[in-house]
């Protein structure tokens, strides 16, 4: 990133369900990162990324101007990645080739936190740790409800200290019910409709018990 004061807060608001194309200046002044399991995407057909090489997709439809239909490769920034840490165990730096098209995609849970491109280079793979998660939390800029989801995600991934920190910082008497609801909803496995304590593991139960013991 250059030494000026440009940040994600300078990006134009993305309209609902829509996308905004980034300028070269914006691309060059943001630090992009990506998290996934190993070098494979769990979305779609399980695309395996090449490291330090250009990855290019045929599934690219910016003409739709639709955040859900644009396709391409997704990635984020440090201020937003906390929301997506549940989706992987390995963090990568993202480099955009000079001829890549890059779009900021509307995301209510992480505004200016979902970017997509037709071409991407990933580099510098490193395992995500609790310490890294804590660092991302300290840098994070997210809507309140997203912190409750991120708290659940961190507990699922084993970043317990970060999850506890989020709980202590963000959960209070006025938002307790929504926080507990968001946490439980995030724990429910795919294919199930309602929460059960049977879905809790050792780490998620620690946060669950903090809710049960919270003095309202």
Describe these PLM feature segments.
Residues 11, 32, 58-128:
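ADP-ribosyltransferase catalytic core
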Residues 1-3, 8-9, 19, 27-30, ...:
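Intrinsic-disorder/low-complexity regions
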Residues 1-70, 212-214:
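ADP-ribose/NAD+-binding catalytic cleft of ART/PARP-like enzymes
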Residues 108-176:
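Active-site-proximal loop/hinge segments that shape catalytic or ion-binding/gating pockets
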